[in-house]
Amino acid sequence: MSHALSDGPAPSGALESVMTLEQFILDRRGRFPQSTGAFSRLLRDVSVAAKIINHNIRRAGILDVMGESGTVNVQDEKQKKLDEIADRELERALRRGGECCLVGSEEQADTISLSPRGDFQERFAVFFDPLDGSSNTDVNASVGTIFSVYTLPEGADEGDALDVALRPGAEQVAAGYVAYGSSTMFVFTTGNGVNGFTLDPGIGEFLLTHPDLQIPQAPAMYSINEADIEDFSPELRAFLQWLKTKDPDTGHRIRARYIGSFVSDFHRNLLTGGLYMYPATSDHPDGKLRLMYEANPMAFLVEQAGGRASTGHQRILDLQPEGLHERTPLFIGSAPLVKAAEAYLQGRGAEAVGGA
């Protein structure tokens, strides 16, 4: 494929050849653990929904879909109009595709069966946060979609589908996110590395722009809502102080950046190196991020990119989920910083990470 697909001449430094997301999936299908046509179509369905969601976000002000819808979700959070649109479009795309038997969404109280016959012959279950950081849409800031894919074992039926789908994140067969920002990126893993695709609006295709992503181990940034600092544990406060201390030998200081959209903060830290934190607090002892469709997919992805994800005491991907909307503390990003956070939270402090 060449620049003939794009509008106008290619700028200096542009990619000389590109691969679409669909071509990439077909080309590498033999390397995927679930290398079937149904699995490939499932990923295509998610990408189609992402394009529709992106279209609505880009035109939200014109279409009058900014602001709240007047309803609340199961989390007792006020829903944005775009929350409902994104949720609907993902469910529609997966229902039309016919490869998915079960979906679980942040916006729905319970899982939804997509199996038309109720026999669950379709083997994939998909969990998603349809529009992470949706409060940012009214101020034209970045938002995202997160998704997680599992296979259901033979013999699962509608009665026990959720029970058998609630499995540790280490058993995911695919996970990823879509970042809707200055450009729109689709980033995913199937357990064989991480690849990022940028949407070319001229041709309506996701093109491979970030192959074989690896998170830098030298951290550049940390992300946390420090407005909650009075609710943090003494160990976490000590860790934050350590993070802010300039390296006496190099003069390097880790900078703070926090957008308020998990996808956006994570995406930046994936590219630059860093740590995202949403800890347990006195008000939220179990944390706030949801395990099945926020922490698990991002943990699977970051480990494939050479990073680490933890509650501060346990690997995220080892957690056994107890419910669709279960919450967890999360420390995710460059492995050295996650390990440092674990050391502080476990009472080993500065000595374990080489001092402040």
From Swiss-Prot:
Sites where the protein binds Mg(2+) 1: 106, 129, 131
GO cellular component entries: cytosol
Protein EC: 3.1.3.11
Keyword field contains Translocase: no
Pfam families membership: FBPase, FBPase_C
EC top class, as a word: hydrolase
Main location: cytoplasm
CC cofactor: Mg(2+)
Cell compartment(s), UniProt: Cytoplasm
Involved pathway(s): Carbohydrate biosynthesis; gluconeogenesis
Keyword entries, A-Z: Carbohydrate metabolism, Cytoplasm, Hydrolase, Magnesium, Metal-binding
Binding site for Mg(2+) 2: 129, 132, 294
GO BP annotations, alphabetical order: fructose 1,6-bisphosphate metabolic process; fructose 6-phosphate metabolic process; fructose metabolic process; gluconeogenesis; sucrose biosynthetic process
Stored SUPFAM superfamilies: Carbohydrate phosphatase
Catalytic activity: beta-D-fructose 1,6-bisphosphate + H2O = beta-D-fructose 6-phosphate + phosphate
HAMAP family per UniProt: FBPase_class1
Quaternary state and interactors: Homotetramer.
Protein name: Fructose-1,6-bisphosphatase class 1 1
Source organism (scientific name): Salinibacter ruber (strain DSM 13855 / M31)
